[in-house]
Amino acid sequence: MKTYVLKVEPFTKFDEPKAQALKPLEEAAEVFGAWQASGIDGAGSITPEMREDIVYECFDTIQSCVNLLESIGTTDAELRDSARKVYANNVERGRYDPY
């Protein structure tokens, strides 16, 4: 199974709490916009620029989620526990075979 290992440094300055919580939603909408603009749904071929835009917006979403986690004081242990739970749920849903 392919696994992405990323280094994401959380911000040290945060927006007010509601704005911080809304940021991942805003960034996720930008991912959808980039995907929509790419025509990747089968209507056409994706250009390298469009692919780069999708990847950029996905990472921007990851960054905003990491910032939110940092702003509420999330620990590594909490992240590992949540990762295990999400993995188990996805196996249960048949999204991939367990390793």
Q: What spans do the regions from the language model cover?
A:
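Flexible "arm" and connector segments at domain edges
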Residues: 1-99
